[in-house]
């Protein structure tokens, strides 16, 4: 049975959230968080950080008021629509990202919340540990996580939207997908635990599109 759920909320500000997702979805997203908390599920809220939501600490306070006790955040991953010039212009530098995260960690500690930063290679290990964050992220593509797109396409991780899927869960045998050459190659790189995002670094045939 379902016991946990993660919801992406870009901002406590409806206008910012809606602008970043390209739809008027803020109210439905917040309602979903409330419903999941009320149902007794373990709820985490993830926020990809960019120049439009540098007040992330306020978003942490907002989701705490909704009953959320665990939050994660990440850099803006260059995949799908985030590869465009307009999106690239909103990406934070390492220094900016560190400042945003440090302020949010302070709020999370004040409220007794747990927080993790999940983008491998974006911030140095010593930077994360200096904030008291114990999770040093590594890429889990095809290793600890994969994702299924709405059309059934199987992708290495939830952000890997730029290249052809590894297969389709509706029409292809799972073992064939899992043991395919592409899947195995991505998994082998993830297993090195190099604290690098394969989408940022480029990985074999993916380098031309990621």
PLM regions and their residue ranges:
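Radical SAM enzyme [4Fe-4S]-AdoMet core and its adjacent flexible, acidic
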Residues: 3-4, 8-140, 145, 150-154, ...
């Amino acid at each position: 049975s379902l016991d946990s759920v993660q919801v992406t909320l870009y901002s406590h500000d409806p206008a910012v959230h809606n602008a970043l997702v390209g739809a008027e979805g803020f109210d439905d997203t917040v309602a979903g968080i409330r419903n999941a908390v009320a149902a007794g599920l373990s709820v985490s809220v993830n926020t990809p950080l960019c120049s439009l939501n540098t007040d992330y600490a306020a978003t942490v306070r907002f989701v705490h008021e909704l009953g959320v006790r665990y939050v994660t955040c990440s850099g803006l991953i260059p995949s799908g629509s985030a590869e465009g010039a307009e999106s690239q212009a909103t990406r934070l530098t390492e220094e900016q990202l560190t400042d945003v995260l440090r302020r949010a960690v302070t709020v999370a500690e004040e409220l007794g919340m747990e927080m993790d930063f999940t983008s491998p290679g974006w911030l140095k290990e010593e930077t994360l540990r200096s904030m008291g964050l114990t999770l040093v992220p590594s890429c889990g593509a095809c290793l600890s996580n994969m994702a299924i797109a709405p059309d059934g396409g199987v992708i290495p991780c939830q952000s890997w939207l730029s290249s052809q899927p590894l297969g389709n869960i509706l029409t292809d045998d799972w073992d064939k997908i899992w043991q395919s050459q592409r899947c195995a190659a991505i998994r082998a790189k993830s297993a090195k635990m190099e604290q690098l995002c394969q989408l940022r670094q480029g990985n074999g045939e993916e380098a031309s599109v990621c």
